[in-house]
């Protein structure tokens, strides 16, 4: 088998439980990003991502362009239609599986807008939660949304967090205040705009347990909250290589990773170039890709 030309997308069985890796927060030139959708997909494919959500600010042109590209080139990652929408003062939400652009929310319409988004099959994620204003109106708004079951999860791992000195304390506080009590899913995304300070596509990511490798299979996993957030690839930072998620999915992914560790012990039968590739894939968190190769 020629490892250099191995096509992961074509190798995926259509009906089998597996982990897919997605970056759910990427900006393109259609908002304030520096990459075209084509460049995003090329980079994501080269870094073994199975899916990406192109999430421009109140805009889905980038996502639609990306989806058109994937229909022509099957080796590219799947594209989820998404957008990032502001409720004011860095209080942002990721709307995944959306069909129309959504202008910024206000206090009067956010509940009705997210209710309609949910009715149409959409997923709602609170983005970079540490930037949410510590104001009564924002916290009250989030509680109302959670009480109405309109928020599916929180983007706990966003590569911007690694610029915060006490980020672990912040993560634990968010877990204790919001994620744990409301049993929210834990998501990861790079919030990629440009190649800057290690904030690369795939740095923040989400592992999703899917039965069908398809856009609908990924949406189903998001809705069922079968996911674990990962943070990888931030060079020279002690926080690289983290996995956080709700049970049973966190333990499930951990067992999957431990089984791969056992298989890696027997790498002596492979040429050295393959051994280096396998170890690099493991250290970079590309677990399902590695499992398919082994």
Predicted regions and their residues:
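Charged catalytic cores and adjacent phosphate/nucleic-acid-binding surfaces used
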Residues: 1-24, 37-42, 87-102, 134-294
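Short acidic, glycine/proline-enriched helix-loop-strand junctions
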Residues: 7-9, 60-80, 174, 184
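Surface-exposed amphipathic alpha-helices with a cationic face
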Residues: 16, 21, 67-72, 109-125, ...
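Histidine-centered divalent metal-coordination motifs
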Residues: 25-27, 57, 128, 193
């Amino acid at each position: 088998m020629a490892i250099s030309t191995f096509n992961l997308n074509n190798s995926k069985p259509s009906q089998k439980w597996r982990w897919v890796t997605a970056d759910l927060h990427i900006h393109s030139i259609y908002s304030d990003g520096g990459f075209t959708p084509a460049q995003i997909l090329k980079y994501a494919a080269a870094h073994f991502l199975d899916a990406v959500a192109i999430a421009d600010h109140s805009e889905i042109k980038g996502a639609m362009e990306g989806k058109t590209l994937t229909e022509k080139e099957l080796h590219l990652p799947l594209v989820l239609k998404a957008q990032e929408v502001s409720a004011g003062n860095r209080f942002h939400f990721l709307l995944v599986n959306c069909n129309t652009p959504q202008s910024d929310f206000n206090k009067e319409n956010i509940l009705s807008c997210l209710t309609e988004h949910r009715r149409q099959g959409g997923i709602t994620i609170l983005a970079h939660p540490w930037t949410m204003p510590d104001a009564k109106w924002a916290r009250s708004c989030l509680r109302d949304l959670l009480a109405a079951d309109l928020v599916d999860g929180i983007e706990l791992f966003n590569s911007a967090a690694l610029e915060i000195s006490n980020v672990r304390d912040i993560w634990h506080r968010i877990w204790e205040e919001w994620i744990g009590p409301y049993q929210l899913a834990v998501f990861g995304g790079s919030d990629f705009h440009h190649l800057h300070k290690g904030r690369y596509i795939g740095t923040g990511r989400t592992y999703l347990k899917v039965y069908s490798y398809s856009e609908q299979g990924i949406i189903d996993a998001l809705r069922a909250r079968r996911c674990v957030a990962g943070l990888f690839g931030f060079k020279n930072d002690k926080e690289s290589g983290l996995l956080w998620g709700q049970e049973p999915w966190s333990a499930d992914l951990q067992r999957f990773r431990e089984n791969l560790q056992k298989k890696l012990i027997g790498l002596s039968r492979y040429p050295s170039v393959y051994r280096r590739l396998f170890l690099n894939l493991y250290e970079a968190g590309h677990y399902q890709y590695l499992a398919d190769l082994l």
